[in-house]
C-alpha cells in the first residue's frame, strides 16, 4: 500500500489542470518518450521549426513532436501522395507530411492566417519541400464545397489531416468523406481535447478548452456511428482519430 508521501509524489507527477498538451499522467514519462525516441530522430528542419514555433505566443496550437513523428511514419506506411491539411499554423505537421510524401507528392494546405504559415515557411523552403505545398489562405469550407461541386476531386486524396476550428469538424467531415479515396485516411486532431472529454463539469479548464469540448464530444460520437469509415482513436499528442473510408 502506498504511503501518504508516495501518494503525494504520485499526484505531483500528474497534470493538475485539464488543458495540458500531453495526455500522459506523468510529465517524466512523456519527457522520456521525447528524449529517447522522438528528439534523437527528429529531422533538423523539424527541430528548427519547432524551436521557431516555441517563441510564438500561441505555440500551444502546434502539433507535438511525437505526433509529428507519428504522422511522418503513417504517411510512409500508406504510401500517401495526394494529401490535404486543414489548419496549418506555422507548419510543423505540414513539414512532417512534406518530408514523408514522394518528390511529386502534393499537399493542399488551408489556413485562415497566412502570417503564421510564413513564420515557418523559410524553414520549409530550406528543407527543399515547399514545391509540394499549395497554400490557400481563408476558410476551408468554401474551398471544399467548390471541389465537391466540380466533381474532379471526388475520392482523390490519400490522406487528409484536420487540426483547425473544432466547431466545424462535423462540417469538415461531411465534405471530406467525399474527397478522400476508399481506403484513404482522414486524421482528426485533438479528439481527446486535453483530456476534457472525460472531465466532470466542474473540472478546472481553460476557457477555450471548455468552449470547444462539446464540439469534440459531438464529433467523436458522430465518427463512432458513421458506417462509411473504420476508426481508431489514439492517445498521441492531444488525441488523434484516424478514419479509414471503406465505402
UniProtKB/Swiss-Prot annotation:
Q: How is the cofactor bound?
A: Binds 1 divalent metal cation per subunit.
> What metabolic or biological pathway is this protein involved in?
Aromatic compound metabolism; phenylpropanoid biosynthesis
Report any Pfam family annotated for this entry.
Methyltransf_3
Q: Which UniProt keywords apply?
A: Lignin biosynthesis, Metal-binding, Methyltransferase, S-adenosyl-L-methionine, Transferase
Q: Where are the transmembrane segments?
A: none
Q: What is its EC number?
A: 2.1.1.104
- Positions of a divalent metal cation binding: 163, 189-190
Q: Which sites bind S-adenosyl-L-methionine?
A: 63, 85, 87-88, 93, 111, 140, 165
**Entry GO MF terms:** caffeoyl-CoA O-methyltransferase activity; metal ion binding
The catalytic activity, as recorded, is:
(E)-caffeoyl-CoA + S-adenosyl-L-methionine = (E)-feruloyl-CoA + S-adenosyl-L-homocysteine + H(+)
Please tell me where substrate binds in this chain. Answer: 21, 163, 194
**Known cofactor(s):** a divalent metal cation
Query: Signal peptide: which range, if any?
Result: none
Highest rank taxon of the organism = Eukaryota
Q: What is one GO biological process annotated to this record? A: methylation
Q: Which family does it belong to?
A: Belongs to the class I-like SAM-binding methyltransferase superfamily. Cation-dependent O-methyltransferase family. CCoAMT subfamily.
Its biological purpose is as follows:
Methylates caffeoyl-CoA to feruloyl-CoA and 5-hydroxyferuloyl-CoA to sinapoyl-CoA. Plays a role in the synthesis of feruloylated polysaccharides. Involved in the reinforcement of the plant cell wall. Also involved in the responding to wounding or pathogen challenge by the increased formation of cell wall-bound ferulic acid polymers.
Query: What is the name listed in the Swiss-Prot or TrEMBL entry for this protein?
Result: Caffeoyl-CoA O-methyltransferase 1
